[in-house]
């Protein structure tokens, strides 16, 4: 199951958008895992207005062993697709294969990324207006599902090392399958990255122990029957069947929810209420629902058309599905809202609100002080030119006593002796750190290892 937190991180990343071909709603959440290793692409049109075709590109990348390869895919794979000759020739199945292979090539050419040991699954679709075609490329155990007349149709298949076709390639490349894992380690048999399993120079990309070459499935679109596409990582599919997910999307549409809200609620359904169960629901979670729009149809009209279909489903409510997924957990005393307590943000108490307001007041006073000069690039360059500046320490401007009093009064305790003379302030650690920083003594400054410059960008979302 991997390392997990004592409480899940429930902040959600959400994106939505629409054009004349597709509409989408994405939600992603770190959950119980120590870090977020998922990424995504959301491109309603990867061509320019001058091009004859209109092609949408969506993808989910589920990282393992780190987030770097997944992040690279989220940031770079659209550009890599646009570089492929096959893409500009309109050969979309070949374009996806070439894109996956060349992503591996570019990772190995990158001086930083070639030393990275992480990898990621990739499930993606191209939707072409002129070809009336949907193409899915998949490597790994993320999954893409098409809803057709309310029924789930698989557009991808999970690549597990126990599958006969996958195991034969692994063994032929001098690998082995042990405990249902590649070389006793990796729980999936296709991925981008994972170069420790692709080190045989005598073998092509499709022959390596772990290959990045995707399975391709083509589907000719029938807009009277084809409704939407769901792309999600295994954090979703470990909890729901493909049909479950299709039914939940239709349920959300009948309830008047947007695609964004539906994706968010599906994550709520799938997040484990505790880590004491089977381990499902404790993974990172990413899901995007892509609406397939008819010519001249907007997302509101599409939603109305979906509601009018009135498909029969076995799903009564989001809460009921959650109770069924986590049947080991006692929800008997929970109403339908309390069932989702683990992903519901708690309202702040008065102490927390007062503390944050006081800290914000001190910070604002410090930033507004005319004596406090921001460290701009020009300042840094000047310091680099002047060796004597390296030994100088920065100091903040005068302390705003009113703000200081607010900080102490809101966050600390004030005590006096029996004569009412001696005053003692008791500060929480966070308030003390803020006070010291305001006075020009940042407690973190003596620990340079805590000063990290981390890029938290986890995906790409762009509307043209």
UniProtKB/Swiss-Prot annotation:
| Cofactor(s) in the UniProt record | Mg(2+); Mn(2+)
Under the heading SMART domains, the entry gives: PP2Cc
Q: Which GO terms describe its biological process?
A: negative regulation of endoplasmic reticulum unfolded protein response; negative regulation of p38MAPK cascade; positive regulation of autophagy; regulation of mitotic DNA damage checkpoint; signal transduction
Q: How is the cofactor bound?
A: Binds 2 magnesium or manganese ions per subunit.
| Biased composition, class Acidic residues, residue ranges | 366-384
Q: Which GO terms describe its cellular component?
A: cytoplasm; cytosol; nucleus
Q: Where is this region: Disordered?
A: 361-398, 434-464
Where would you find this protein in the cell? Nucleus; Cytoplasm, Cytosol
Name the keywords, alphabetized: Cytoplasm, Hydrolase, Magnesium, Manganese, Metal-binding, Nucleus, Phosphoprotein, Protein phosphatase
Query: Keyword Protein biosynthesis on this protein?
Result: no
Q: What does this protein do?
A: Dephosphorylating regulator for many key proteins. Dephosphorylates the cell cycle master regulator CDC28/cyclin-dependent kinase 1; its activity appears redundant with phosphatase PTC3. Dephosphorylates HOG1 at 'Thr-171', to attenuate activation of the stress-activated p38MAPK cascade; its activity appears redundant with phosphatase PTC3.
Q: What is this protein called?
A: Protein phosphatase 2C homolog 2
Protein source organism: Saccharomyces cerevisiae (strain ATCC 204508 / S288c)
